[in-house]
């Protein structure tokens, strides 16, 4: 991956991920009323955010407030990210192989099918009227958008991550085993308290 980055930096070229076509009819989307093709564009990060050093936000303090949900029902994934940011931000930072770079090439590591997978991304994001339509940052950081895009690419499309499991998301983000409890289960309250006491990441999601 480092050789790939060095190639684009040396040749001063912008990386374009051919596996993920930047069109509203590409593999990222399924037709839906909120996705109007004439308004929907993939804009590169530099045209959406002001140019700042460390725009991924990884060299700065990560906070849950950096995460804003957009027009996609992936709160299960975003809430899992928020929980990690709250308690173990260093684990989240380790998911990114590269920091901000002019080539627009990024690699996000996610745990999938029992092993870590490296998801190669460019810095084009779905936008409407020049603003991200899905996950949004609190400022100029793009780390939230990159994580969501990696999750979408892993599953084949943004549409396919519309609704899901917090447990699945946490496993992908940490590679650690997770347990699921329903609120009506007799041992749920005890399990939550034990989780907090042991320093485990605890999330709650509805359906």
Each language-model region and where it sits:
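Structured alpha-helical subdomains that flank or immediately precede key functional sites
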Residues: 1-207
């Amino acid at each position: 991956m480092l050789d790939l980055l060095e190639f684009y930096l040396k040749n001063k070229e912008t990386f374009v991920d051919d596996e993920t076509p930047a069109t509203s009819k590409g593999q990222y989307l399924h037709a839906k009323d909120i996705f109007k093709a004439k308004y929907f564009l993939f804009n590169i990060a530099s045209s959406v955010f002001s140019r700042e050093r460390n725009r991924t936000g990884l060299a700065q303090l990560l906070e849950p407030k950096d995460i804003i949900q957009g027009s996609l029902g992936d709160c299960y994934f975003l809430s899992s990210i928020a929980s990690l940011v709250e308690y173990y931000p260093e684990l989240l930072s380790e998911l990114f192989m590269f920091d901000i770079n002019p080539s627009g090439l990024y690699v996000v590591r996610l745990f999938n099918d029992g092993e870590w997978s490296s998801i190669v991304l460019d810095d084009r994001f779905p936008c409407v009227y020049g603003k991200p339509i899905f996950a949004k940052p609190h400022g100029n950081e793009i780390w939230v958008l990159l994580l969501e895009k990696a999750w979408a690419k892993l599953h084949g499309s943004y549409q396919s991550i519309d609704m899901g499991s917090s447990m699945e998301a946490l496993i992908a983000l940490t590679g650690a085993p997770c347990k699921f409890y329903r609120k009506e289960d007799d041992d749920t309250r005890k399990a939550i308290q034990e989780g907090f006491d042991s320093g485990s990441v605890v999330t709650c999601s509805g359906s």
